Design a protein with these regions (language model features):
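Beta-strand-rich assembly/attachment modules of structural machines
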Residues: 2-271
Length: 271
């Protein structure tokens, strides 16, 4: 199968009953009627005066034992639940993009997520499914996916040696960060126990276009590249520099871009 088409199929591998496939989207297996759910979940309006770390979480924060904390608007929750970037979620009322909520959710004792021994920056596949069910049950989310051809980046091997090393701690939470500064982006990047798939996802957040991993590099790695220009304010230039120094390459291309369209969403039932 064409690698671009394969990438499109991967986006729709985990769909909850609240979202269906649009006519333009390749077919995928239907969602299981026994999708996992949180054992308990509380949803509250954000309290800006609460100094608790978890109450002021921005986006997803995973804790030991699979506990999920989320802080932000409903639209951001949709992004987290479906593993999408902000530019891939459209539609919905204005409040869904501006009104902040705090969510504290716990999986059941027999959930695989209960065995998570560390704090995680990204949800597991099971946690995403549970967040999708939460959106359906508490926010009344109805949505569909559309796929169109558009500009994408292809991440491939470059001409320089790879700057990846074996992970110092293979049990650590995967991270890949290109550092941002108030004056811009300086070209420093650090990865810990991360994969090239995850690196591609992170790069897509900075470039605001999908980055498709075609490096052929498997496994988990650490990497570190030092800053080169602390005054740089051009994100694209800095990202290209980081990628090149890692022994990789970015090229513009055309490929499938999947978008989740919010058809309906309600204010949630609060606790």
């Amino acid at each position: 199968m064409n690698p671009l088409a394969t990438a499109a199929l991967l986006f729709v591998a985990l769909l909850s009953p609240s979202c269906h496939l649009g006519a333009q989207t390749p077919p995928a297996a239907p969602a299981s009627p026994s999708s996992p759910e949180f054992e308990a979940a509380t949803i509250k309006h954000h309290n800006p005066n609460d100094t608790n770390l978890y109450s002021n979480a921005a986006g997803f924060m995973g804790s030991v034992g699979g506990r999920v904390f989320f802080g932000g608007p409903a639209k951001m929750l949709v992004q987290v639940a479906y593993g999408l970037q902000d530019y891939q979620v459209t539609g919905g009322p204005e409040w869904a993009a501006s009104e902040r909520f705090e969510i504290n959710a716990v999986p059941s004792d027999n959930s695989p997520s209960r065995k998570i021994p560390i704090r995680k920056a990204e949800p597991t596949a099971e946690q995403r499914q549970m967040l999708q069910v939460l959106l359906l049950q508490r926010f009344g989310l109805r949505c569909h996916f559309e796929t169109k051809q558009g500009e994408v980046y292809l991440l491939t091997r470059g001409s320089k040696p790879l700057k990846f090393v074996a992970p110092e701690n293979p049990d650590s939470d995967p991270r890949a960060i290109v550092y941002m500064r108030p004056t811009g982006i300086d070209g420093k990047a650090i990865g810990t126990n991360t994969t090239t798939d995850y690196l591609a996802t992170r790069l897509g957040r900075y470039l605001r276009l999908p980055v498709l991993n075609q490096t052929g590099v498997t496994g988990s790695w650490d990497f570190h590249v030092d800053p080169i220009d602390p005054e740089n304010q051009d994100v694209q230039t800095a990202v290209y520099s980081v990628v090149e120094r890692l022994g990789l390459k970015l090229n513009r291309s055309r490929g499938p871009i999947q978008t989740l369209v919010i058809d309906h969403i309600d204010h949630p039932t609060l606790d």
